[in-house]
Every structure is written in C-alpha cells, then in structure tokens.
Amino acid sequence: MMSFEIKEWFNAKELEGMPGVPKLATNITRKAVAEDWVKRQRHGGKGVAYEYHINSLPEETRRAIKGASLSDKPVHTSIVHTVDERLIYAMSFLTPDEQAAAVEIIRVAGIKGLMPTIVSKDKALEALGITVEQQKTLQTLQALPPEKVREILSQYEGKEHNFPVRENDVKKAV
C-alpha cells in the first residue's frame, strides 16, 4: 500500500504566495501572532524563527497545501493507488485518534462499517433530499408484495412525481 505524509509544520517563508496568507513572510508572521497560530521554534537558523502547525493556518491555505501535496505525487495508472491517495487525503482531515478509530473500523468491518460513524442513515437521506414522509412511503411499499407495488406505481405513471409521495397515498391504494 502506498503511503505518504502531509507536512504538518511550515515556516513563514514556505507560506509565501499561498492563498489565504499575506505575500511577504514578515506579514505572515504578523498574521500568525495576531491570530495566535500554534507554533514551535525552528532551530538551526539565525535568530528566532518559528514554524506554524497546518491546523492553525487559514482553511484556504490548508486546502492549497493538501491539494498540492496530492498533486505533487506522480500520476498512477493503477486504480488502487488512486483509491489509496483519496483515502489518505480524507484521513488527513481527522485527528490522530479519529484516524486510529477509522482504521480499526475499516480493518474489522470494511468501508461499509465506517459509513454509520460518519453520517447517520437519516442524515444521508436528508442530504439526498428524501423527506421522512417519503422514507415512510418507501417502507410501506417495501412491505407489500411486488405485484401490489407495481399496481400502485402504475397509477402514478405520467404524473408529476411518478411515485406516491405520501404514506397515506399507498395506504389508500391498498
């Protein structure tokens, strides 16, 4: 499995020209002080220099760094590497504890096991624009024999929705 790390600490000089931060290193340092970025002292240079943690940087800057980190990698012909890279990228947004938990869930239950921890079924359906009433309608339809479902759905062909919108519509048809 291919793996790579996204760098976590950046000095002001490395951040020059990045989106979301000033163009000059001195102004980046001022912004870091004003916004209280997490920093550590950098050793080996003249005077006092700091590196700033990626999680302290503006969102726009973090996205650019993470995007550049992925795009700097050679293009792979194997789909496995593409999936690996996307998974690594997604995991980079998690804390170390969340990463460990996600890896364990995937190891035990596969990627399907991870989904309920990310988003509930109700939230996923809501994101798709499926209302609670539509969910109830679907559950009612699923409980019926297939021939009855076909009969009910045939009544809605050519209509605006092509399906019963409310649970009561199904109950009336039964």
UniProtKB/Swiss-Prot annotation:
Induction: Expressed in the early phase of the viral replicative cycle. When present at high concentration, negatively regulates its own expression by binding to O3 (PcM promoter). PcM promoter, and thus Repc expression, is blocked by Ner. The host SsrA, the ClpXP host protease that degrades Repc, the Lon protease, and the stationary phase-specific sigma factor RpoS are all influencing viral repression in response to either temperature or stationary growth phase. Decreased availability of host SsrA in growing cells would favor latency, whereas starvation would favor Repc degradation and hence induction.
Region (Recognition by host ClpX-ClpP): 170-174
InterPro entries hit by this protein: DNA-bd_dom_put_sf (IPR009061), Mu-type_HTH (IPR003314), WH-like_DNA-bd_sf (IPR036388)
Tree of life domain: Viruses
Record GO terms (molecular function): DNA binding
Compartments reported by the entry: Host cytoplasm
Transmembrane domains' residue ranges: none
Pfam families registered for this protein in UniProt: HTH_Tnp_Mu_1
Annotated HTH Mu-type domain residues: 6-73
A single BP term in Gene Ontology: latency-replication decision
Keywords: DNA-binding, Early protein, Host cytoplasm, Host-virus interaction, Latency-replication decision, Repressor, Transcription, Transcription regulation
GO cellular component, one term: host cell cytoplasm
Domain notes: The winged HTH N-terminal domain cooperatively binds to the enhancer/operator region of the Pe promoter. The C-terminal domain (CTD) regulates DNA binding by the N-terminal domain and degradation by ClpX-ClpP protease.
Family according to the record: Belongs to the mulikevirus repressor c protein family.
Subunit description: Homodimer. Three homodimers assemble as a homohexamer.
Function: Promotes latency by binding operators O1 and O2 in the enhancer/operator region, thereby repressing the transcription from the Pe (early) promoter and blocking the expression of the genes required for replication (lytic growth). Competes with DDE-recombinase A for binding to the internal activation sequence (IAS), which overlaps O1 and O2. The outcome of this competition determines if the virus enters latency or starts replication. Makes the cell immune to superinfection by repressing genes expression of any subsequent incoming viral genome.
Official protein name in the record: Repressor c protein
The organism of origin for this protein: Escherichia phage D108
Species classification: Viruses, Duplodnaviria, Heunggongvirae, Uroviricota, Caudoviricetes
